[in-house]
Amino acid sequence: MPLLAEDEKEKEEAEEAPPAISYYQVKPSLIANLASGGKYIRCDVQLMTSDDLFLEELNTHGPAIRHALLLLLSEQDGRDIKTSTGKEGLRKKALSTIGDLMQELSGKNELKALFFTTFLVQ
């Protein structure tokens, strides 16, 4: 009977374990002219998911993801995205844009978050 108790304990621990997190890095760095003219943005983006199959979908649709992000970045005003509030707004908009795109292309959206790991406006 003690063996059964150990099996139950292991099963409970496995159920309580947080899902494995994976990241998809949009490569190479994104560089786009800003709508405000004369300025550009350079940034690196990481997409977080807890679904390994969805990670493969992100890889498959990498060019479409990159294109959508470049279009979104080129619509931005440099003054707005220099503030932390502006960056957070852009992050949320980018997450929504990529989530909608993945829903359209793969039939699901398993994105958990989007992170800017480099962010430069000049």
Show the residue positions of the predicted features.
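Flexible, low-complexity charged segments
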Residues: 1-122
